[in-house]
Structures are given as structure tokens and as C-alpha cells.
Amino acid sequence: MNSRFLILAEGAFSPLRSKTANACIRYTPQQVVAVIDSTRAGDTAQKVLGFGGDIPVVSSLAEGLARKPNALLIGIAPPGGQLPASWRALILDAIDNRLEVWSGLHTILGDDPEFAARARNRGVAIHDLRKPPADLDIARGRVRELDDRATVILTVGTDCNIGKMTTQLQLRDAMKERGMRVSFAATGQTGILVEGWGISVDAVIGDFIAGAAERLTLQAAKDADIVLVEGQGSIIHPSYSGVTYGLLHGSLPHAMVMCAQPSRTAINNHPWVRIPPLAEFIDMQERAAAPLRSAPVIAVALNTYDLGDAEASAAIDRVQRETDLPATDPVRFDPSPIVEAIDAFHRKRFDGVRSSATLGAGAR
């Protein structure tokens, strides 16, 4: 992907409200020329997010065009994933300036007659990251075929937008540095943008969510010993738990990594849904997985972006005491505690597989 992205995040560029923009800036900063948000114009990505260096925030498309982009990236994923009406004219203007459009919205821009005709006339492409394949099927438990050759790790969380994708990408990079055979299965539009492939499971017909997760997991396992599946939502989320359960049942993880934010006590935008204490939540999560597979939570990834260094370290120590599990913030600190927990779990599994195979051969 040789895109030079101008990212549209008008009125929303921030640590929590511009997930797609933030991931693109964190993992492919060399492809970002600027971010459009008139409310933060003059700032840099570093000032807004704490990373991204001197990528500028500009006030308008016209100002961004001066930096020679060749693509416009929709940098937010609002609740419901619909295109803000106020952005329509800007996107058409971008197409008129021969920018490709990359979108992770539920609104499929390529199916919109006006956008499609304008893009066709200008000779540019529209990439809808959330558009699912047409040939999806139901899940059939086929991930069990991996039991003797790969370990599947799913990130789960106490809420949405809490670090499930970022944790897996941090772990993937750290594992590759150690020479481990690992792959990342993207299940959301932002992960697809970063990784270059995947299926946005929240855009899939309900009957096929687990089937999409199954397909992704099997595909990711072709050249990997460890498959890191990007989690979505939360089992207690009143809006998105259906996706969470479909992903859990389709990917059939062997183990899970719990993602949490120490300062978050209720589901975002649903303050009436309180988040249980973490040890209790972990028990709930393991019981949710148990009918199809016993899958323990083996580590905790914390999102401490809103805490000072001392507070973050104290939160990690507290979680380790309360859960008796390794914990860290894999972005702020070293992800090694989680990497080592996964590696130990994987080795223990396959010591057991080899022992069973040896016993079976002896019995014959």
C-alpha cells in the first residue's frame, strides 16, 4: 500500500474518538501527511495523541491538499458507523481532487451512486474496509483442526475501544522480534487497514459472524504457530455483545488476554452498565467460553493512557495482585510479560500434544 493519507477526523481527533486515525498514525506514520480537524488545527499528532511526531493537524481539505496526499482516510468510526452528513461535500471534493477514499464506516461509500459515479469519472478507487465477502458461511467448529499445530489467542475486553487490536499488534511485533512464527487476524476495519487483510465481523450478517471468525483464524494459521485474533466489543456491552460472542465461538481460542482500562468503571455511553471488578470479569469471560472450549485468561493488557507514570505502574501492580496474572500496558511499557505468558502457554500445550502422540504410538 503506497498511499499518502490525508486523514479526516473533523471534531473528533483524540485518544479515544479517532481509532482508525490513531492506528494508522501509530503503525504506518510514514503514510500520513496530515489530519483534518479544525478544532485542533495547528497542533501535531504528538500533542494530541502522545505519538505520531510532527504530523500536522490542519483545518481543511484545501490545507491538507498542499501536502500532496493521494488518498483520503475516514479516521473515525462513530457509533453505528454512519457517514456524518456534513462530510459528504468534503469527500466529493476530495474525489474531485483525485484522492482515493478509504473508509471503515458501515455506510458503504462505493455503493452510494453519487460517490461511485464521481470516483469513476475521476478515475479513483473507493476502498470500503467494512464490506464483507459475499461467500461467508456458518461456523462449523473447524478451528479444532488447529489443536495439534497452532495456538489461538483472542483478546477480550471489559468494553469497546479499550485496546484489543492495539494489544495484539504490539504482541505481534514483539513476538516477531523474538523470531516466533506469529500472525494477526484482523476482525475490524482498523486492523484491516493496518494489516492489509481481514474481515470486519461487525458488518457481517448475524448467522455468519462466527463463520467469518473461523475463516480468518484458519487463514491466519497457515504459516504461524501462534494466531493472535483481534477481539471486538465485550460480553457485557448492551449494543455489541452479539459480535463478541460470535467472534468467541468462531475463533475457538485456546487462551485469552483480557484488556481493561483501570480508570473506566462503566461502559462508555452506557453509564448504567457498571464494569465488574476485574477478577470477577475474568471469571465471567472464562465461563462464557467454556461451553465450546476451556480457554483461560492468561494475562492482562491495561490501557493506562490517561494515568501518570506512577499511577500506571501502581495500577499494573494492583491488577497482578488481584488476578494473580501477568499484566502490563503493552504500549506504554514492555509487552514482554504477556508475550512470555503466551509463549509458556503455547509450549505447555505442545508438550502435552507431543506426549499424547508418543503415548498413542507406544500403545499401538
Give the positions of each predicted feature.
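N-terminal leader/targeting and accessory segments in enzymes
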Residues: 2-121
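C-terminal lobe/tail of nucleotide-utilizing enzymes
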Residues: 5-8, 12-13, 31, 43-62, ...
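ATP-dependent carboxylate-amine ligase catalytic core
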Residues: 3-4, 10-12, 18, 26-27, ...
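Walker A (P-loop) phosphate-binding motif
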Residues: 140-182
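Flexible, glycine/proline-enriched loop segments at strand-loop-helix junctions
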Residues: 102-106, 154-162, 199-204
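Short, hinge-like loop/turn segments at secondary-structure boundaries
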Residues: 50-54, 114-124, 144-147, 199-204, ...
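Conserved catalytic-core segment of NTP-binding enzymes
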Residues: 107-109, 113-116, 120, 128-129, ...
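Structural motif
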Residues: 6-8, 73-75, 154, 226-228, ...
